[in-house]
A protein has these predicted regions:
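Bacterial Sec-dependent N-terminal signal peptides
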Residues: 1-24
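Short loop/turn segments immediately following the C-termini of beta-strands
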Residues: 36-38, 85-87, 135, 145, ...
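A short beta-strand motif characteristic of beta-propeller blades
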Residues: 57-63, 106-111, 162-168, 218-224, ...
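Blade-loop segments of beta-propeller domains
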Residues: 58-127
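An edge-strand/N-cap motif at the start of beta-rich repeat modules
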Residues: 19-49
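Short loop/turn segments immediately following beta-strands, especially the blade-tip
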Residues: 48-54, 96-103, 143-152, 201-214, ...
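Beta-rich, blade/repeat-based domains predominating
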Residues: 40, 65-76, 114-125, 129, ...
C-alpha cells in the first residue's frame, strides 16, 4: 500500500462527511493522519491523496483511542499500529485493521505500554514485533504480535537512566524515536533527556512471540551527541551510508556516516 503518514495534528472541529469512493487513479495514495484527540473523536483519519494535484478526500476514521499521535502501517497496508499518548498508566499501543475494500478502520486490540507518553511506534523488520518509545516513561516497550496482527500482552520493557545539561527538559531520559537500521541489524533509540542514541544489536536468534528475544540488550552501546542537543528523530539516506538527527533543544541537525551500527558525526547544521 502506498501511504503517507501525518501525526500530531489537531482534530478538526467540523463533523466529517460519509466515506467517499473515488475513481481509481495511478497517482492516488492513502494518507493516514494521527492526532491528539479524545476517545470520542476520530483520532485517526484516512484520506485519498493525489500525488500529482495535492488534493485529498476524506475516506473514513476511527474513534476509541486517546491521543493517537503517531502511527505506522504494515507493509501490506492491512494493519495500522498507533500509540495512545497519555501521560501515565493509561498509555497504550493499538492495533487497527484497515479494510481497503470497505474503506473501514477497525480497532483489533490495545495493550498498555507500561511507560508514559509513548510518542513513536515502529514495526520490526520481520513485522512480528511492535515497539514504542515512551517519552515520559524513559523506556522502550516491545510487543510480540499474534498471527492476526494483534498485540500480545507478554511485553518487554527496557528502561534507561541519566540526565543532561538542560535543567528543565533533561532531568531524566526521554525516549523520542526508535528506528531500525537499513541493514536490519540494529535498533537506534534517540533519547532527548540524556543526549544519547542508544544502540541495540538485533538478535540472530529471535523467537516468535518472545519479546525479550528481539534485541541483544547486554550488547547495548551509546552514541553521545553535544550536551543540550535534545535528540528527537533520526532517518537514513536512501544509500544507507548516512543518517540525519534533528535535535529539539539546540535546533541543530547532525549528519552522520553509518557503518555496522556505528554513527560518526560529520556535520552539525545550525
Amino acid at each position: 500500500m502506498n501511504s503517507m503518514i501525518l501525526g500530531g495534528c489537531i482534530p478538526s472541529p467540523k463533523k466529517q462527511t460519509e466515506p467517499i469512493t473515488v475513481e481509481k487513479n495511478p497517482n492516488m495514495m492513502y494518507m493516514l493522519v494521527g492526532s491528539y484527540a479524545t476517545p470520542d473523536e476520530e483520532g485517526i483519519k484516512v484520506y485519498n491523496f493525489d500525488e500529482q494535484t495535492g488534493n485529498s478526500q476524506y475516506i473514513s476514521g476511527i474513534k476509541g483511542i486517546s491521543n493517537p499521535s503517531f502511527l505506522i502501517p504494515s507493509a501490506d497496508g492491512k494493519r495500522i499500529y498507533t500509540v495512545g499518548e497519555d501521560a501515565g498508566k493509561s498509555s497504550t499501543a493499538n492495533a487497527i485493521k484497515f479494510d481497503k475494500e470497505q474503506k473501514k478502520l477497525t480497532l483489533l486490540n490495545s495493550q498498555p505500554t507500561d511507560g508514559g507518553a509513548p510518542c513513536y511506534i515502529t514495526l520490526s523488520p520481520s513485522e512480528k514485533f511492535v515497539l514504542t518509545a515512551n517519552y515520559m516513561g524513559g523506556s522502550i516497550t516491545v510487543f510480540p504480535l499474534d498471527k492476526d496482527g494483534k498485540l500480545k500482552s507478554e511485553t518487554r520493557l527496557i528502561s534507561f537512566t541519566g540526565n543532561s545539561l538542560d535543567k528543565e527538559r533533561q532531568t531524566q531520559p526521554h525516549l523520542h524515536c526508535i528506528k531500525f537500521t537499513p541493514d536490519h541489524k540494529y535498533l537506534l533509540a534517540s533519547d532527548l533527556g540524556t543526549d544519547q542514541i542508544h544502540v541495540f544489536p538485533v538478535s540472530e536468534n529471535v523467537t516468535d512471540g518472545v519479546s525479550h528475544s528481539l534485541l541483544n540488550e547486554s550488547e547495548e552501546f551509546n552514541i553521545k551527541v553535544e550536551s543540550g542537543s535534545g535528540p528527537r528523530h533520526i532517518c537514513f539516506h536512501p544509500n544507507q551510508k548516512f543518517a540525519y538527527l534533528i535535535n529539539e533543544i539546540s535546533g541543530k541537525v547532525i549528519a552522520f556516516s553509518y557503518d555496522k551500527g556505528k554513527l560518526n558525526a560529520i556535520q552539525y547544521i545550525e
